[in-house]
């Protein structure tokens, strides 16, 4: 438990029902010791406790997690830290991740868009190939997000564009 970290998050407006301030490296270690389990992940997700939700994303078997479930989880994500963990460790590794991410970046909801851009950025880091039509669509959506008012979406969109530029010279 890290009271300083949880207090800092609370002061920044990140208010889970409970927040112990446990760091991601420690949670990853706990998840690796626990192993993958969809039942455990679902039970953990139901708690509005930061560490439980992060652990849920880390222990859910990626091959069993589907975009419909991701849509439900995204509706319940309120803070960027959880969006980042879910996008990196679960959403980008699920079946049909790219299709879901394209849908998310077109959403009116800022957290949903943020998850979409983060998921695409992680897919591109994983050397995932995208056809020219998809590349242009991502560029158009990313440029719109960068010129928008949502700083988090703009940063995630910039990461996607940077990755596309690096890969496509």
Name each region found by the language model:
Residues 1-169:
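Alpha-helical scaffold domains
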């Amino acid at each position: 438990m890290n009271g300083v970290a949880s207090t800092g998050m609370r002061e920044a407006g990140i208010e889970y029902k409970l927040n112990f301030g446990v760091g991601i490296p420690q949670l990853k270690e706990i998840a690796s010791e626990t192993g993958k389990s969809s039942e455990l992940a679902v039970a953990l997700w139901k708690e509005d406790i930061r560490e439980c939700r992060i652990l849920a994303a880390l222990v859910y078997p990626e091959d069993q997690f589907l975009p419909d479930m991701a849509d439900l989880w995204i509706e319940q994500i309120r803070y960027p830290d959880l969006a980042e963990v879910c996008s990196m460790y679960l959403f980008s590794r699920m079946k049909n991740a790219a299709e879901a991410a394209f849908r998310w970046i077109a959403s009116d909801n800022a957290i949903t868009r943020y998850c979409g851009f983060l998921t695409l950025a992680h897919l591109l880091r994983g050397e995932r190939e995208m056809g020219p039509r998809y590349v242009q669509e991502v560029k158009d959506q990313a440029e719109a997000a960068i010129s928008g008012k949502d700083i988090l979406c703009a940063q995630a969109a910039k990461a996607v564009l940077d990755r596309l530029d690096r890969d496509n010279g």
